[in-house]
């Protein structure tokens, strides 16, 4: 067994406590590649922000769990090389769907895991979550649970409809499971197509689609039930229209891709929401830069030539999210 502490990683307990008290949210960025890891670390160091590096089941299948673990260890050392004496980096399993996968990640150096039992009945979700919590807490690994279902498709996570979290269930769920944080459903959605055009209104000035607002009334009720308890938002990419436009300009086909408006995420970050997950925006930033590079340099074939601008574009996006949306900059240590 490898402890996350041997890798220089931290769990989420203290950083969430500080985030809730400070009215900001910790960025949780998914990564699959070295370039994503480098961009995340560079952005976190430059903004003096704690950061959560997330690995989905699909990422583990693509890049191998052991390799990703050592990439996370490398991220800690890389942050130090960049001048950060005490980086606060979490290696988190995103959407673990079984006790076995959570245990495997805990045993392999992950400092935080999510057990997603949201597709189960209330009692089954409690039982599965508690089983993971009981194992994880033996090794000081923190556990995120989920109550409510997000719509959308991203990696292996798929649901046709969302089911909002019921505030009346959260006290019993948190108490009986002992989870450290709770992912809720208040209108966010996985993927780059978070809403259909029929669900949106059209801005008369810009002509852009405007998605429906998040259910902040449900969030407020949950905060009343669980004061100070760490809340998590999944599916929170904003799907920047400039990146979508670049992709479409250079041969892509992403019609009506739409995300969560950043002003709504800013509002959420000032509440008990202390972790906000962002994945699709990174994919869009990477894809836009690569498509543009090949259009402008059709003779290039060295991966470094097109992955370098992709890395820079992702870093720019990560810094924007940290500083302008989540407010976690300057909160390291």
Q: Where are the predicted features?
A:
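Generic N-terminal amphipathic, Lys/Arg-enriched alpha-helix
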Residues: 1-27, 300-301
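A short N-terminal beta->alpha junction/helix N-cap motif
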Residues: 3, 24-32, 59, 305, ...
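Alpha/beta enzyme core
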Residues: 10-21, 34-59, 65-86, 95-230, ...
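Short catalytic-loop micro-motif centered on adjacent basic/acidic residues
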Residues: 26-30, 91-92, 114, 231-233, ...
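An acidic- and aromatic-residue-enriched active-site/binding cleft used to recognize and process polar
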Residues: 148, 236, 281
